Amino acid sequence: EPDYRVKQRCLNGHAPWPEGICTKCQPSAVTLQQQQFRMVDHIEFSTSNLINDFINFWRSTGYQRFGYLYGRYEPYPDVPLGIKAVVEAIYEPPQENQTDGLSLNLPWNEEESVDEGAAACGLFKVGMIYTDLMDAGQGKVICKRHIDSYFLSSQECCFSAAMQTKNPNVTKLSASGKFSSKFVTCVVTGNENGEVDVHAYQVSSTCEAMVAADIIEPSVEPSVMRVKESTLERYVPEVFYKYKNKYGVNVQESAKPCFPVEYLLLNVTHGFPLNQTPLFTSPKSFSIENRPGIEAQDLKTLQNHLDATKGDAHLVNVLSDFHLLTYIKSTGIFDKKDFDTLARIAVTHSEADAAALSENSGWQTFLAIMQENDNAPIRNQDVNFGATQTIPSVAVDDAIAEGSASSDARGGWSCRHCTYSNPRTAVNCEICVLPKD
């Protein structure tokens, strides 16, 4: 595993960096070349609706969009020892629209909750996806990324390297317990025919190490990566890259001050299965998160979504929606055991589990709260940033079990709607937000 940082514990008897350095603790020169292997060979989207729903935001607003790919890894038989990432869902974190792109604040508050919800479904982050679309009129989009411009900009390469470092590939065959990353980057942009297309990439392990060592930085020219200068706090080794000149001879040149980003890129193929069998099969999609002004995620929307539920078989179909599951988890009403039951119904489509859920006290309480709160959302979204606020993390079943006796002993009052025991000074119920009287 490449590492271009100065070793901090050198045994040669000199002062530690930056006061001293020797040939044993300083990193060796870097020679850039195309990486000969890929950690992931193919990206498979379980259904085309994933991409259509994702780019609908751009179609509606003209703004770009970012999302995380949740899925799993499977063998890819089309290449020897191949690995493919199967994408089952796209989650869109809070983001702020800009005229020239978008702004992210990562990690966001609910990232851990979303990851736990995905894990309950047997999924985890396998990559990220974002749009880079510009309308050309007549149903076409502008082709901005091609062989004469760039495929992935230097800034995007640094971002991908940081995300790959954050999501390493765990292996027992490495001394550090990890090696490179299977995290992929997908860009939805226009192709040479003016059609919307997906391009998938990874950056090399060399790029990951150079970004971690603070050796490179983005350039104003998107197709060029800049090598930083050495300072008292940062040691930058010699960086070279090789290419064939017009005579077909291999030539080695210094990469300072800059070099082409193609030396850091890896192409990854993508596609859709011939027989689409997605994990989530809800016939009607629930509202997508963090789309203020376009789609709302609140109790009223959820109640309307569940109102059509007729019997356990239909409940199985309605619950089989990743966005629905993550929203329900964000409310904090269900404990881990009950939410795991919801997730199991969503992915296994078991009518027996759905029948058991219908009789579950937690589910019945959840339905009762929704009926009493047609206009009182548990979760509110900020118009500018998509920030969320959730109800207090209190188990509803435990609150019901406390009863009115303990409430009277503390001088509080019990909500006549959900029976939660509130403090005496509370005007509205802390759980269902309804007034005391």
Task: Name the predicted role of every residue range.
Residues 1, 18, 92-150:
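Short HxH-centered metal-ligating active-site micro-motif
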Residues 1-12, 16-38, 108, 144-168, ...:
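C-terminal functional modules of predominantly eukaryotic multidomain proteins
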Residues 58-62, 70-75, 120-124, 137, ...:
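Eukaryotic assembly scaffold/adaptor repeat-domain signature, activating on surface loops/turns
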